[in-house]
A protein has these predicted regions:
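Conserved glycine-rich cofactor-binding loop
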Residues: 12-13
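Conserved glycine-rich Rossmann-like NAD(P)H-binding loop of the short-chain dehydrogenase/reductase
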Residues: 28-42
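Residue(s) in the substrate-gating loop at a strand-loop-helix junction
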Residues: 133
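C-terminal helical subdomain
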Residues: 173, 193-229
Length: 229
């Protein structure tokens, strides 16, 4: 029997890691695309079965294409979860060209991975899950560039929905609020450890996401907004 595969980007830490861990426990084969070789090696050791890691940059078109074609040879690609992201929190006058390029990596990777998965699947029988942020729904002080990239991801997600309406390609937008993960480690000037400790547990968020994308054969949950208490 052909194995069902969930591809995820950015699955080595935080919410991505929790999705990997829980999805394996639910019987899926996971293929993780991420750039951190050291973290990937730890996951290779931790998940010795039903898991395969691909180390590389999801903004590299050749890496994405080669990886997804290799994955297609392993079984049935059923889900694509775009979870990778980078953030930069500064005052509006402080952003640089490098900040823009770094922040846009998530959007570029989302587009490249989705495009290649759609090609391999011949635009059929694929569920695309784009994990963004509540910042994709509103503007936040101190998050001008982050909001801009998330609004771009949301625009791409909504356009995909229209493009594949009435087909077997389903598109889900996920909009979680702040989570207590290492995402904030490089932005402690913006969010302190004390503050992030009050944010949502990524384990709970991963459970909500997987419950909604895996459990219902007769319906599709189009959008999920997850707010912290």
């Amino acid at each position: 029997m052909e194995k069902d595969i969930l591809i995820i980007t950015g699955g080595c830490s935080g919410l991505g890691f929790e999705i990997v861990r829980q999805a394996i426990a639910r019987g899926l084969f996971i293929c993780n695309l991420a750039r951190n070789k050291e973290k990937m090696e730890k996951l290779d050791s931790l998940f010795q079965s039903n898991y395969k890691g691909f180390v590389g940059d999801i903004t590299d078109e050749k890496f994405v294409s080669d990886s997804i074609h290799q994955i297609a040879a392993l079984g049935n690609i059923k889900y694509l979860v775009n979870c990778a992201e980078k953030a930069c929190f500064k005052k509006p006058v402080e952003y640089t060209s490098e900040d823009v390029n770094t922040s846009l990596a998530g959007l570029k990777g989302m587009v490249l991975c989705t495009t290649e998965a759609l090609k391999v699947k011949e635009e059929s029988n694929l569920k695309i899950v784009n994990i963004m942020s509540s910042a994709a729904l509103k503007g936040n002080k101190g998050e001008a560039l982050y909001c801009a990239t998330k609004w771009g991801e949301r625009g791409y997600t909504e356009s995909l929905k229209e493009a594949y309406k009435g087909t077997t390609v389903k598109v889900i937008g996920i909009y979680p609020g702040g989570m207590n993960t290492e995402f904030w480690d490089e932005s402690r000037h913006y969010v302190t450890e004390e503050k992030s400790s009050t944010f949502m547990n990524p384990k709970d968020v991963a459970t909500v996401i997987l419950d909604n994308i895996l459990n219902y054969s007769s319906l599709n949950v189009a959008d999920i907004k997850i707010e912290r208490n």
